[in-house]
């Protein structure tokens, strides 16, 4: 499996979604043994007015991690639970072949985030995969019309819907972790067996450790077995002989190889929420007041701009004396864990 790593990289700007078997599609209302929806974000590569092309994972109140190959820059946007966040800066891993970057969000102050899985024993672990993008389309059978299903087409457009599935880590190398898309009750299939498809690159592979969900991988690509080119479909059996098991591969950036680098880039986590801390340094000071002043008397605050970049504390749609009062109450507070 490791030999196909270079071949399963999708073209620049492409990303992934999630496809399940019809009998394995989870009920997201009743399936609670998984990470919170709020730890996955939509990556909007080209900013306002452009559909997204990927996903990201929240790893700190003001930081997400994602892959390099879906492109974008500081003009890109991140949407988490319907709220749009702008970007302060992006730092890609210094090694070119490492498909990983850290993104600093502007005044996000998110309460839901995950730690990095840094134990290098991923092989054999059950995982939960999450990301925005395309899902399962019509079944593929051979001969056509026979009902002998070997896979599914990808369906949907854009990355507006969050999907979750389960899988298992089958193998690892220094850069990546790997899984495959088994048929139900075949191979190492899991309860909600699924595979990434289109518009989910940067989405998370999560492993439960010590009672907490931790991010172990970032979705990067998929491949049919052998030399078969990806054709907007996912297979679990051979396309010319559905009696033969033929599971597609899926791959993710291995977070345990880069957890220390990620931790060195992001700021320390504050000891509880700090109202008015715009720059994420766990204190409310003149730097934060300068940020607040830039939004003073705005009347267009809403989820599309993170309520005027967090300055509309109430929030009621504008930045006024009520918000100034909130800022004053927390002046010079310091909350570093």
Segments (PLM) and residue ranges:
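Bacterial N-terminal signal peptides
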Residues: 1-11
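C-terminal subregion of chymotrypsin/trypsin-like serine protease catalytic domains
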Residues: 16-36, 54-70, 159-164, 169, ...
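A conserved glycine-rich beta-strand in the N-terminal activation segment of trypsin-fold
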Residues: 38-61, 86
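A structural micro-motif recognizing beta-strand termini
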Residues: 43-45, 103-110
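Catalytic-histidine neighborhood of serine endopeptidases
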Residues: 59-61, 65-98, 108, 121-128, ...
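Acidic glycine-/aspartate-rich tracts in secreted/extracellular proteins
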Residues: 69-75, 106-111, 132-137, 171-175, ...
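Chymotrypsin/trypsin-fold serine protease catalytic domain
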Residues: 106-195, 219-224
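Cellulosome-associated attachment modules in secreted, modular CAZymes
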Residues: 269-337
């Amino acid at each position: 499996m490791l030999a196909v790593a270079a071949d399963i990289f999708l073209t620049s700007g492409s990303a992934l979604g999630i496809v399940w078997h019809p009998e394995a599609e989870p009920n997201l209302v009743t399936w609670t043994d998984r990470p919170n929806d709020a730890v996955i974000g939509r990556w909007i590569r080209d900013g306002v007015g452009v559909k997204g092309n990927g996903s990201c994972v929240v790893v700190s109140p003001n930081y997400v991690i994602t892959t390099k190959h879906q492109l974008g820059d500081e003009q890109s946007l991140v949407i988490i639970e319907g709220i749009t966040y702008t970007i302060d800066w992006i730092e890609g891993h210094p090694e070119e072949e490492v498909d990983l970057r850290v993104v600093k969000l502007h005044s996000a102050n998110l309460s839901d985030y995950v730690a990095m899985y840094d134990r290098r024993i991923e092989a054999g672990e059950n995982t939960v995969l999450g990301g925005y993008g395309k899902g399962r389309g019509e079944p593929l059978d051979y001969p056509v019309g026979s009902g002998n299903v070997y896979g599914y087409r990808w369906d949907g457009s854009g990355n507006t819907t969050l999907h979750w599935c389960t899988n298992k880590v089958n193998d690892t190398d220094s850069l990546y972790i790997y899984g495959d898309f088994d048929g139900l009750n075949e191979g190492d299939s899991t309860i909600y067996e699924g595979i990434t498809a289109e518009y989910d690159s940067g989405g998370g592979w999560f492993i439960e450790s010590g009672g907490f969900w931790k991010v172990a991988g970032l979705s990067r690509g998929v491949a049919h077995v052998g030399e078969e080119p990806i054709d907007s479909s996912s297979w679990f059996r051979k396309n010319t002989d559905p009696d033969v098991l033929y599971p597609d591969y899926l791959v993710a950036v291995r977070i345990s190889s880069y957890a220390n680098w990620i931790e060195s880039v992001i700021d320390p986590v504050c000891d509880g929420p700090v109202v008015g801390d715009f720059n994420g340094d766990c204190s409310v000071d003149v730097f934060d007041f300068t940020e607040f002043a830039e939004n003073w008397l705005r009347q267009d605050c809403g989820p599309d701009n993170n309520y005027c970049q967090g300055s509309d504390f109430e929030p009621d749609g504008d930045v006024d004396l009520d918000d100034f009062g909130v800022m004053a109450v927390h002046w010079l507070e310091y909350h570093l864990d």
